């Protein structure tokens, strides 16, 4: 169900609709493609328990009241019940419609034509305060329709949070801002603690999986630039597995990430969000995810979060506490 002008309307996955702001978008980001309609039975280790706790309902209420999107909802994250039940959420900035259409992602796609909510930075900061978060993850849709890709708006949100409480740790999982350094600088020049940009998959599968405007080395060069400009900021990336890659390609991707100074990497199982998206090619066992973690630590990452249900922002605060990283 999509809420449009205060009315709940059923919008079919893969179909076009008009947003409250007057522009067209595609539900779940990918048009109806029958050739992708392959259903693969999930193994038992991927089954999730629903937990509509008081904390879950509190987080839902706060984000709705402040007109905020969350990647938890828009990207159909399998961990939404667990995370929200623990009072944490990943806030998705600049609306719920992305200008890019990656073939794994269920976020709606379209052209927002420059629309932005000018109150969002303060609304996000107030929501973080109401949730009592000590560590917050911000992410956003890609906004190629904006001159700076939305970097200024993103930076204003980080600053608003830090102005409310400078002790709150902020992780910014950002777009690539088209690889333009002046845009990346806007994020670096805030008091952000962690900057993440997801590589998503191995080099060979980048264009079959990601939007053509994204790039394997564009992501790596983004992270390299961040580390060169601000060595004390932790850098992070994430890989999905199960899209047709080999373990050798995963290890090569780890090497490439380490070569540009990436500190933290996460690995999780790709799960097809709708029948229109890329099919799952394999389900990786929990034991193999443990092996990925072992290899990653041996390669020099400060931390490796690896497991079937791991997503880039999953338990982000606990990742750092576990290894006592100096935030």
Swiss-Prot record:
Pfam families to which the protein is assigned, alphabetical: LIAS_N, Radical_SAM
Catalytic activity, EC: 2.8.1.8
Location (main, coarse): cytoplasm
Drop me one GO molecular function for this one: 4 iron, 4 sulfur cluster binding
Would the keyword Transferase be found if you checked this record's keyword annotation? Answer: yes
The entry marks the following residues as binding [4Fe-4S] cluster 1, namely 72, 77, 83, 313
Q: Which cofactor does it need?
A: [4Fe-4S] cluster
Q: Which GO terms describe its cellular component?
A: cytoplasm
Concerning InterPro entries, the annotation shows:
Aldolase_TIM, Elp3/MiaA/NifB-like_rSAM, LIAS_N, Lipoyl_synth, rSAM
Q: How is the cofactor bound?
A: Binds 2 [4Fe-4S] clusters per subunit. One cluster is coordinated with 3 cysteines and an exchangeable S-adenosyl-L-methionine.
Quote the catalytic activity from the record.
Answer: [[Fe-S] cluster scaffold protein carrying a second [4Fe-4S](2+) cluster] + N(6)-octanoyl-L-lysyl-[protein] + 2 oxidized [2Fe-2S]-[ferredoxin] + 2 S-adenosyl-L-methionine + 4 H(+) = [[Fe-S] cluster scaffold protein] + N(6)-[(R)-dihydrolipoyl]-L-lysyl-[protein] + 4 Fe(3+) + 2 hydrogen sulfide + 2 5'-deoxyadenosine + 2 L-methionine + 2 reduced [2Fe-2S]-[ferredoxin]
Q: In which pathway does it act?
A: Protein modification; protein lipoylation via endogenous pathway; protein N(6)-(lipoyl)lysine from octanoyl-[acyl-carrier-protein]: step 2/2
Q: Which domain of life is it from?
A: Bacteria
Domain called Radical SAM core: residue spans: 83-302
Where, subcellularly, is it found?
Answer: Cytoplasm
Alphabetized UniProt keyword annotations: 4Fe-4S, Cytoplasm, Iron, Iron-sulfur, Metal-binding, S-adenosyl-L-methionine, Transferase
SMART domains to which the protein is assigned, alphabetical: Elp3
Can you tell me which residues bind [4Fe-4S] cluster 2?
A: 98, 102, 105
Task: Indicate whether S-adenosyl-L-methionine appears among the record's keywords.
Answer: yes
Q: Which Gene3D superfamilies match?
A: Aldolase class I
Similarity annotation: Belongs to the radical SAM superfamily. Lipoyl synthase family.
Q: By its UniProt entry, which PANTHER family does this protein fall under?
A: LIPOYL SYNTHASE (PTHR10949), LIPOYL SYNTHASE, MITOCHONDRIAL (PTHR10949:SF0)
> What's the protein name?
Lipoyl synthase
Task: Name its species.
Answer: Francisella tularensis subsp. holarctica (strain LVS)
Protein's gene: lipA
């Amino acid at each position: 169900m999509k809420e449009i002008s205060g009315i709940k309307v059923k919008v079919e996955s893969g179909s076009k609709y008009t947003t409250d702001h007057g522009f067209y978008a595609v539900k779940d980001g990918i048009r109806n493609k029958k050739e992708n309609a392959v259903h693969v039975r999930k193994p038992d280790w991927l089954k999730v328990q629903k937990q509509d706790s008081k904390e879950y309902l509190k987080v839902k209420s706060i984000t709705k009241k402040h007109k905020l999107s969350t990647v938890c909802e828009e990207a159909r994250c399998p961990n939404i019940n667990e995370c929200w039940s623990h009072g944490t959420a990943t806030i998705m900035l600049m609306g719920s419609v992305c200008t890019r259409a990656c073939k794994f992602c269920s976020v709606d796609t379209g052209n927002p034509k420059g629309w932005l909510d000018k109150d969002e930075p303060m609304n996000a900061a107030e929501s973080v305060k109401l949730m009592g978060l000590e560590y917050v993850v911000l992410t956003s849709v890609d906004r190629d329709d904006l001159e700076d890709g939305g970097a200024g708006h993103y930076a204003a949100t980080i600053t608003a949070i830090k102005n409310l409480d400078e002790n709150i740790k902020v992780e910014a999982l950002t777009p690539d801002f088209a690889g333009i350094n002046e845009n990346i600088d806007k994020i670096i020049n805030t008091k952000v603690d962690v900057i993440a940009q997801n590589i998503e998959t191995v080099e060979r599968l980048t264009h079959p999986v990601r939007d053509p405007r994204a790039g394997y080395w564009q992501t790596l060069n983004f992270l390299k630039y961040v580390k060169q400009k601000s060595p004390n900021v932790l850098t992070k990336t994430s890989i999905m597995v199960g899209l047709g890659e080999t373990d050798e390609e995963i290890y090569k991707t780890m090497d490439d990430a380490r070569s540009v100074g990436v500190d933290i990497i996460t690995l999780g199982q790709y799960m097809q969000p709708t029948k229109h998206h890329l099919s799952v090619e394999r389900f990786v066992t929990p034991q193999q995810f443990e092996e990925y973690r072992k290899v990653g630590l041996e390669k020099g990452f400060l931390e490796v979060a690896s497991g079937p249900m791991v997503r880039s922002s999953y338990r982000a605060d606990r990742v750092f506490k576990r290894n006592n990283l100096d935030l």
